[in-house]
C-alpha cells in the first residue's frame, strides 16, 4: 500500500470515528490534515493518555493531525514502519477520547 493510500485510510478511519462519537462531518473536505515528525519531548503530555510512555519508547514520532469543527484528532505512528500506536481526540485544552493500537 502506498503512502497516499495509507493517508486516505487514516482520514477515513478518523472521519468514521469522529462521526460516530462526536457527530462530526464525514466529508473529507471538512477536515484539515497535517503530518509532522516530532521528538518525544515536543509532545504535550497533557494531551496524551497516561500510559503512553509505557507503550512507546522511540525518540521520534510521526503525528498526523485531523482538524474538524472544534476537535483535533491525532494518530501517533512509528517513524520507521508507520504502525499506529495511539489515536487521540482533543477538544479545547483536553483529551476527550483515545484509542490504543496493538
Question: What are these regions, as identified by a protein language model?
Answer:
Residues 5, 85-87, 102:
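Small/flexible residues
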Amino acid at each position: 500500500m502506498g503512502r497516499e493510500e495509507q493517508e486516505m485510510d487514516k482520514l477515513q478511519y478518523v472521519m468514521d470515528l469522529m462521526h460516530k462519537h462526536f457527530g462530526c462531518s464525514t466529508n473529507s473536505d471538512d477536515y484539515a490534515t497535517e503530518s509532522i515528525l516530532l521528538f518525544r519531548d515536543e509532545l504535550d503530555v497533557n494531551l496524551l493518555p497516561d500510559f503512553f510512555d509505557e507503550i512507546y519508547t522511540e525518540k521520534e514520532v510521526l503525528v498526523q493531525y485531523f482538524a474538524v469543527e472544534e476537535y483535533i484528532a491525532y494518530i501517533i505512528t512509528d517513524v520507521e514502519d508507520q504502525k499506529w500506536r495511539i489515536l487521540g481526540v482533543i477538544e479545547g485544552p483536553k483529551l476527550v477520547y483515545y484509542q490504543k493500537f496493538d
